[in-house]
Amino acid sequence: MKSAIRFSVMGLALALAVSGCGGTKSETSDGETVTVPAGTPPIWSLTGLPGPDNAQIQPIVVVKIENDPIVRPQTGLDRADLIFEELVEGGMTRFAVVYQSDLPDEVGPVRSVRHVDVAIAEPIADAFVFSGGARRTMKFVKRKIPTSISIVNEGAPGMYRKPGIPAPHDIFLKMSEMLDSIAPKNTLSTGFFVRPEVKPVVESASPSASSSASASPKPSSTALTGKPVTQVGVKFSSFSGPNWKWNAADKMWMRSEGIKPFLNKDGTQFGTNNLMIIEVREIDAGYKGSTGGYVPRTVLTGSGRAWVLSNGRATEVAWRKPFVNAQMELTDTSGNPFTMP
């Protein structure tokens, strides 16, 4: 049996850590009390891992981060609960990075928003951070993102240009400064997936692919029914095609760009416990890039196939996300709800 799989995809990668239920009462920073459904232990909304009593009212922050080779290693990727990788112009990819349980001091480089980021942020975000965007995309953001989500652009508290780095790669986010400037959270957060949700991280692909990073895996019988796999390649374009290799000792999928390890800021190789590769549609964004080239638009609504990679195995599932503001549902090939490991 072959132990390597290559998926040809066109534009989205997702990394996710999932949630569970809540229980107990917690206070927000402005003193308002939020009631968490009783009878459930405190967990982080995105990872489903044990957390403090107020875990589910901690803010969820979605940040758009650049992935041009010249900016690697980026700052803060290894601290994320969830990472989406998506195709942009020029055949390159960028990340929509989601934080809650582990907030880094600094994140970046921060770059511009795309339509697909709205479908990522709207169901879960309290703060949506990006440098700016094309006029058509910004109109979509303003139409779809509710006022309950704080939109943070260049010039907002916490956003700054780092000296010594050429524009446009120099915009970074100081997380605590930004969070201090937005309205306090007073509602319970939800995960990206409809319960039962993912426990570790996910990666998606299709005509668009996804990559993910998450907390330590708790194997599920569903995930373990998949085919043994030791390597996976996700081809976004002729320019971008990350590879993931299963490290059985660390129980992690380790990322490389070609044969070159994809590194964290501290020099270690980036890895995740679980990946989910999702098939999605890619269409023309309807505007040109800064150099006049084609700009792809990844469509993260509708339904399609996906592959969950966990514990050295790959399992085919189906995904469904009927609206931009809807959570994503996962089912197995028999139509039963799929539980991430």
Please tell me what each predicted stretch does.
Residues 31-80, 89-341:
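A surface/extracellular/periplasmic glyco- and lipid-processing/surface-interacting theme
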Residues 1-8:
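Bacterial N-terminal signal peptides that target proteins for export
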Residues 17-20:
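C-terminal motif of bacterial Sec signal peptides marking the signal peptidase cleavage site
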Residues 11-15:
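Alpha-helical transmembrane segments
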